[in-house]
Each structure stands twice: as structure tokens, then as C-alpha cells.
Amino acid sequence: MVKSPKVYIRDSGLLHTLLGIGEREQLEGHPVVGGSWEGFVIEQMLASLPNASPFFWRTQAGAELDLLLFLKGRRIGIEIKRADAPTMTPSMVSAVNDLELHRLLVIYPGSTRYRLGHKVEVMSLPESIAELA
């Protein structure tokens, strides 16, 4: 594991204001759109799961997990994607195996829920919060 901080701007409205982004169309075409989505998801999860202990995980080899939650005695991995149909990545496989995750949730802006593999499931932000709360 690598010990280094990762900076999130958890208030996406503040981020958008600082960058002069006033409309959704501006955001969609801006390079910060992925980071904005990631920060928004993390803020919503932490606000909805006050008993969770949150961490960021990254290895020397570059595998990373956007959010690692210790919740109700379980290790839950959260990977945040803006893609329409996220697929399994080597980082996800590493996280499931190395961290011995109970499960890994891939959060995306879509609404179709589906499995990617053993312990790995793609779902919407509202579904993930409802399941973990």
C-alpha cells in the first residue's frame, strides 16, 4: 500500500463555481467531469453512511480503489465510473483479492444493475446507498 493523500473537492457545486461551469453541457465537455462525479459520489456515500470508515487504496504497482469502506465489520470496495457500461479492470481484481473484500460496488450514472464477476457488481448511486445503509 502507498501512504499518500488523495484530495477530493467534496462540494461539486463549489468546484463548478470555481471553474466557471454554470451549465450541465459545460460540465459534460470539461476535463474535470470524471473527478466531479467521483467527488459527488464520495460525498453522498459518506453523508449517507456516517458509521463507515473511509479510505483510499493504492498499491506501488498502480492498482487503486476510489473508496474503501469499513462498515459493519466488512470491507466494501467502491469504484466510481462515468462510463455507460463499466467493465472489470485489473485494479478491481487486485482490490478484491488483496484486500479480501466482502464485495466491490462499481457506481455509475446508469440504472441497469449487473454483475461483473465474483463479488463485483455494477449499480447506481441510490441503489448502492440503499443496500449499504
Model-predicted segments: where are they?
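Accessory nucleic acid-recognition modules appended to NTPase machines
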Residues: 1-75
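Structural signal for conserved beta-strand scaffold positions within catalytic alpha/beta enzyme cores
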Residues: 9, 56, 79, 106, ...
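Arginine/glycine-rich "motif VI" loop of SF2 helicases in the C-terminal RecA-like domain
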Residues: 47, 94-102
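Conserved beta-strand segments of alpha/beta enzyme cores
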Residues: 53, 103, 119-121
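Active-site ExK catalytic segment of metal-dependent nucleases
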Residues: 75-84
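Active-site-adjacent loop/helix micro-motif of nuclease/hydrolase catalytic cores
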Residues: 84-93
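Short, hydrophobic beta-strand segments that form beta-sheet elements in well-ordered domains
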Residues: 102-108
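Domain-level recognition of nuclease-like catalytic cores that cleave nucleotide substrates
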Residues: 111-133
